[in-house]
A protein has these predicted regions:
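Active-site gating loops and adjacent loop-to-helix segments of metal-dependent hydrolytic enzymes
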Residues: 1
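Active-site loop segments of alpha/beta catalytic cores
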Residues: 4-198
Length: 198
């Protein structure tokens, strides 16, 4: 069962973020990491279980996705109203080239992810969408091309899309972001401090 907003875990999260916000005041923005619902279900159960239910179009899975999304939406509201979060950092997953087909994501999962993003945008104009590429598997970026956000962030090394090209590609963002390569074997792992700074 999902926790209520009165659950100690939820309240602890809100308390910690509120203390952080009070400590830094307006010195910097504060973003909270809110994964999409299917990623939460995968980490709570297993990839195999979720993908098996997805392939069979099990109604129970879609009911679970809906419930998780509803919890996340309510939690985002509390993060902003009670804890003073600036916006959300919304990692998108389950749309990579090694997973099920892009059409499957578009038809079955995209509506849930988009509704989560839209609710975040209703609560705050300062949300960042992150397109996960950590494991080095390229994403089907076309499924996220029109997601609205203040900033779109992706792994330029995995998805082979430069920031300049991404500025044109993503149609409903205000800004683009991209970081250094953070995978094993990259300079962040192997180089000395000087090389990392450069």
């Amino acid at each position: 069962a999902l926790p209520s907003m009165d659950d100690p875990f939820v309240q602890d999260q809100l308390t910690h973020i509120k203390r952080l916000r009070e400590a830094i005041q307006d010195e910097t923005a504060v973003f909270y990491n809110v994964f999409n619902p299917v990623s939460t279900l995968r980490s709570s159960t297993s990839d195999e279980l979720v993908y098996d239910h997805l392939e069979r179009r099990e109604p129970a899975l879609f009911e679970a996705i809906t419930r998780v999304n509803e919890f996340k939406m309510e939690f985002m509201h509390r993060l902003i109203s009670d804890a003073g979060v600036t916006g959300m950092f919304l990692p998108m997953q389950n749309n990579d080239l090694n997973g099920f087909t892009g059409a499957c994501y578009h038809e079955l999962l995209r509506p849930y992810d988009l509704s989560l993003v839209q609710e975040a945008n209703r609560l705050s104009p300062y949300n960042i969408i992150h397109l996960c590429g950590y494991w080095g598997v390229p994403n089907r970026l076309e499924n996220w091309k029109d997601f609205p956000c203040a900033a779109m962030h992706w792994d330029v090394h995995t998805d082979k899309l430069s920031l300049q090209d991404g500025r044109k590609y993503f149609t409903k963002k205000k800004a683009v972001m991209g970081g250094f390569n953070n995978k094993e074997g990259s300079p962040i792992y192997l180089a000395d401090r000087k090389a990392v700074i450069e």
